[in-house]
Amino acid sequence: MIIDVNTPISSRLDKYLKRLYPLLTQGVIEKALRQKQITVNSQKAEASLRVKGGDKIFINDKFNLPVKQPEKLVFTDAEIKLAKKITTDYLIYEDDNLIAINKPAGLATQGGSKINLSIDSALKYLNYKGADFKLVHRLDKETSGLLLIAKNYLSNVKLHDAFKEKLVVKTYFAVTYGKPIKNVGEVRSNIEKSKGSTPKITDIYSENGKLAITYYKLLKSLDNNLFLIEFTPVTGRMHQLRLHAKLLGCPIVGDDKYGNKEIMPYSKYMFLHANNICLSEKIFGKEINLEAKLPFYFTDKFVEC
C-alpha cells in the first residue's frame, strides 16, 4: 500500500499516520518502522521524521492496518481560503519550530459564540490535512500584527515556557487621542477579569485581579491631538494595552470599549498593531527578531514609515 502525502506543511510521520488511522498506537507504529513494515520513499524512517507533500509512505501488505478511518470533518470555504492565506499572504517567517503571521484587524484569533471564522478554525483545517499547528498566544480581534504559531507540540511547550520566563519581548504601535504626561514611562495596575465580563482596572493594592505592567514611549506627534506611542507589555493580561492607554489618559483611537466620543471620527479601525517580537536565543538556540508591516490605515492616514 502506498500513501501519497498531501499536507502543505511538514508533519511528523507518527502524527500523520495517527490522523489517518486513529486506532494506531505509538508502540505499533515504532515497531512497524523498526521492522521496515512502514517506510518513507522506500527508506527506513524514524517516527520523528517530518513528511511533506510529495513524500510516499510505503506500508507492507502484511501489516494489519486498523480499518477505522478518522471522522470526516467539514470545513467552510472561508476557513479553507483563510488557511491558504496563513501559509502564503499573511506569512512573514517560518522555520522548523514556528511560523509568524501578520494578522489583519477584524480577524479573530480564536472562535466564540458569535465568531464563525478565526485563525484557530483555519489551523484546524491545516491540521486535518497533516500539519500540527498550535496557537501560542492571541491578539484581540481588532488588533493587527504579529502572531506566533507553533509547528509542533515540543515547540509549543518551549514557546509557552518562554512567555512565562519573559524570554519573548513584544512591542506594539498605537495611535492615541492625547498623550501621557511623561514621554517615557511605566504603567502598573491590577486588571480584574470575571467570567463573562469586560476586564477592568482595580487598585494596585487590591486582592482582586492580577498585576499588569506596561512600558511606553512617545514616538511622534500627529495632527488633531493624535500621537504615535510604542507599548511594551511585561505581562500579558486581557486588553492590557487598551486599559493602560486609557489609564494614561490617552485612549487608543478606534477602541470601542475603552475609548471616548472625541475619537469616534477616527474609529473605523482600532489603531493598535503588534509591530515587533524578539525571541531569546535561549528558546531555540538563536535569537529571532520579527517585524510586521504596519497596516495601510496607519501609513495612509497618520504615520509616514
From Swiss-Prot:
Which GO terms fall under biological process for this protein?
enzyme-directed rRNA pseudouridine synthesis
Q: What's the catalysed reaction?
A: uridine(955/2504/2580) in 23S rRNA = pseudouridine(955/2504/2580) in 23S rRNA
Protein's UniProt keywords contain Acyltransferase: no
According to its UniProt record, which residues of this chain constitute the active site?
D140
- The S4 RNA-binding domain covers 11-70
Q: What does this protein do?
A: Responsible for synthesis of pseudouridine from uracil at positions 955, 2504 and 2580 in 23S ribosomal RNA.
By what name is this protein known? Ribosomal large subunit pseudouridine synthase C
Q: Which organism is it from?
A: Rickettsia felis (strain ATCC VR-1525 / URRWXCal2)
